[in-house]
Amino acid sequence: ITNDSQILQNAEKLINWMLESIEPNGTVMPYMELETKKFSQSNDVWYKQKGCLHIKTCIPLLQLYKISKKENLIQTAEQICDNFKLFQNNDGSFMIHGDTKIINLHTQSYAIEGLLFAYSVTKKQDYLTSCQKALNWCMSNIENDGSIPLWFNFKDKSKAIYPIAQIIRLMILTDKILNSNQY
């Protein structure tokens, strides 16, 4: 993080644009329609819908808050993070979208990453607890070959390396925060 005024001005400009995408309840509209200049969502593809993955958007807000101390940034970040309750199942997994049973390991790792970073700044225990529940769910789904499926409750059946690497990194960070060897 820097004190370079030009970089900070650009960061604020980008953050202000992002803030326009955040609804009053903290959900994030995923993209802007260029013709109308309005943020929107679409059922065309999974990443054009509101979802657990957008919890990660709290990170740049909190990073700028740490420099600027502007309260609206931490308040908005907490609004975004508090939406974990809309997406997290009782078993700890995160639904990709609030209106489905589909779970995607990659988007779940985004939610965990956002909540873990938010915990490091806010010390809100429910963020850390949510991360632990999600990581425990991941551990319970490790298959005999050491993998975890990318999708659950979805037509596609595949496995991928990148979310496993993310989950391992998040387990290590969580252990560091907890000063434990749980994961």
Regions found by a protein language model. Give the residues of each.
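Glycan-recognition and catalytic cores of secretory/periplasmic carbohydrate-active enzymes
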Residues: 1-183
